[in-house]
């Protein structure tokens, strides 16, 4: 593992690697996301950071998203769902972050303007996680404006059987998590089998345990590979299932009933892979992969409230809404890629991708209005069914040209052709014995776009790598944003088939330094984005079916309104010249939103957030003890971009972690984390659920 990678991964883990490991050359850390083939992290053309396997084993976090929270530029968001944490990158919402598993996209056509699919994978299957900041990988998809998270799974082992057993208890949720992974190789075959189960209770805060913050998830996965000469074949199967619900604060007792539940969110995938080393004069490698993926979701919502009405005939009106939605997304995709070594030190990767998402949604609902006097007593029941699909064809190419000593120029391009259509939309409502049928007209939307990225790197100084980069981002509206009518929390949001794609231009200057006991990775970035999709209040327009927002009913629709500018500075630094190793990681960000009626820099982003700490490794005859004391903190955040002002105070927590390795081959490990030692009451800027108070997490790991 590289020293640079260990610097970064150590910052996001509960402990770092041993001192002997931190001396390994950084050129041994291989990443694939920026070049679509194995290359060392040091020469990556973009800002990429790695969470390695040791970091994952040391972690006592209940959510894999929490393992990424200390990467500069990354923030956690929860949408009030404790079991479905997501990540933001450089101020961009999770819907603008591309999620990959072994380079294959996890699409989610139900995504809205501030939420995506989430991280539907368990760490037991993972070898590492690669995080690219900004849309700098045209090879995997510039469709992300914020960045890319690529989960790389284990592919086998160097002996017949080896594996990891892990168990963690977390007092913050009084919850347990258990996992096992076994991998190995037999002749030309290699394999991996993994599984996990997590049952987390309600979150414990300084004010007590929070209701409706419990959740469960489980996962299973299999990898089967075969190697024959220059040919490598692979088959992957994995499944992840989650059940969670929404936490909601109602201190004034405004609601008699309020719940948003996801009893089932399940991802199932089958993937095939083929690689061959051609070793021709120019053509060197060919890669092929394809997959089928299904995401199923059940969504249940109930809202009941009573409001006084200044009329003797009504006096008070009780409105009760219930919805139950089942949706299914079926994805098929295929990629073909070639790698060429051309004259004059050119390395060229070209390829083509095809992807199709098909979504079906079945919903049922009930809305009743009853007055205290009985003068109003109305109940409406509805049923609806939607079918829609989106197809994407893309061609991509990226060339690395070493045109002079120490100079490398990378240029990439990707061409998209997208087509979306609503193939069916039926609805029926029942009110007082009257039946009303509706049928939506078939609608379609299409687009084509070329996006580029380029990077210039210089490595002529000792232990220093400099880079300058530019990239374009592109996010096409989801099927939900284009065509579907969705209900949640008592509100209705309408799709808009006239939406345009979101676009961004991104600039970056970066430096990596590894010398004189220092490990530093830093970047200055700037981006301009336009045509952001947001939900607006309905005013009786056609897209809202003539509905208007009111105090008793909430109606919204999607439209392109926002422009955004973002400036930032990221840094990760560690010094290993003393017995105790100080380190720091952080992000400085300023973001501006602009609409036709508003221009503000109060966008809900904390100007500064990060982590600072001291690490120490004690090597003894029978055990190695790695300790880490650190402060995690963020400045205050103010948001007035939605017409109402919200403020989140700044916060800081003191934390301590220790990892103990023992056994003849250091095969046993005990991880202890003491979090929020001062029992601080706080909430992060993009999480709506209050953070846990003082808590302890203890884990046991057995490598065999």
Where do the PLM segments sit?
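Face-selective signature of the C-terminal outer-membrane beta-barrel domain
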Residues: 232-240, 265-432, 441, 449-459, ...
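Gram-negative outer-membrane beta-barrel transporters
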Residues: 402-409, 417-418, 517-521, 525-529, ...
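Transmembrane beta-barrel wall of Gram-negative outer-membrane proteins
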Residues: 169-199, 209-247, 262-279, 283, ...
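N-terminal Sec signal peptide and the immediately downstream disordered periplasmic leader
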Residues: 1-71, 183-184, 218, 270, ...
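Transmembrane beta-strands of outer-membrane beta-barrel pores
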Residues: 167-173, 186-188, 197-201, 228-230, ...
